[in-house]
């Protein structure tokens, strides 16, 4: 019996460790959140853009049935009515087709998993199912009143209340029940069978770690049509822990990664100029971040860009692009995620639509988006830095340099160098490990047909002369081995 217990512990540990692996194809990095996109449009984007630019994966909107809410706010997606795969983003056939097409070009799909709660908005479901939040009846699953925690308001100073009471009035499932666990596992297995590589777990902070560990440990291995035998779903969990919360994000790292919310908060203070950039020399655990092997990191997400002034977003374009460039250049080894937004003036605003139907993005000649889509993943300072991250992968940070509080530069060995200046102008020689020669700055432009579409940077004697004016469109310059003329 003792040998059996040891075996179970070892097997459990192996599964938990495997759930930190995002299953990126070789030479790729970074997940992009194509927030609100239709499944068919994501499939095309995988084939026509993401595969060419080195992106590793896409986080998609929750695929489950949700209420049809007046005005079609984005958050209706986060109120499950059932686990049927039909909503504004598409149906099961289009979802399955998208997952297959993206996998076929080396781009992985991560589903946003909403299993903390069920819908509280009244209406009809997008798969035409009826339900009654008042009596906690969701017959298409089915769930009934006995499958939920008693209704109560959350006290955010109390961990049990956070996990057992209702988030914004949403009906709180009791994941300690075998029946509820089984329904969630069935839903996850359905998505695994279609070929997803993993899950972003919404509101994980509001569920007990032991319950999530049991659920994730019961999910099938990934589909062998796309992944090696025995592969486990990558799990990254929304556990908001800014340092003063009663819930510790480390409690969730035994069975998956966590979204490191402190990452974007801390960088926002630096790139807005309220905390000197020069202090980023020890960026990482020295700033209170978790070890990178347990984290997914980002500058903003779909919630923070709407609800929190503590984070940068696309509306602060210069600082935002520089912060994303820093994230993609730095060796902190959390999985990086880029936000791809649509323009909004109202925090509840629907994705671009003609009413009920989401509009597809259009594209300008330079590759940027139209039809109300922001598409940060198509901005050259961002997609070029995804390539930078691949070029310098596995190489330590060297040649840290600061020319004042808000001017920094560093290298990644002999493969890449980035310089950043906010507030003041920079006009200095900075050390770089790159071989002598002329390089294209991949922030202001690209290397195209043997010439630079943006700035050219000359490296001589191990140094590069960097000029960034305070009114330049971009606050950063980056060069790497693959951008040499």
From Swiss-Prot:
SMART domains: Aamy, Aamy_C
Disulfide bonds: 46-102, 152-165, 369-375, 440-452
Reaction catalysis annotation: Endohydrolysis of (1->4)-alpha-D-glucosidic linkages in polysaccharides containing three or more (1->4)-alpha-linked D-glucose units
List of residues binding Ca(2+): 116, 163, 172, 206
Protein name, entry field: Alpha-amylase
Residue positions of the active site: 202 (nucleophile), 238 (proton donor)
Species lineage: Eukaryota, Metazoa, Ecdysozoa, Arthropoda, Hexapoda
UniProt entry keywords in alphabetical sequence: Calcium, Carbohydrate metabolism, Chloride, Disulfide bond, Glycoprotein, Glycosidase, Hydrolase, Metal-binding, Pyrrolidone carboxylic acid, Signal
Domain of life of the source: Eukaryota
Signal peptide range: 1-18
Entry function: Involved in the digestion of starch.
Protein source organism: Hypothenemus hampei
Cofactor annotation remark: Binds 1 Ca(2+) ion per subunit.
CDD domains tied to this protein: AmyAc_bac_euk_AmyA
Subunit structure comment from the entry: Monomer.
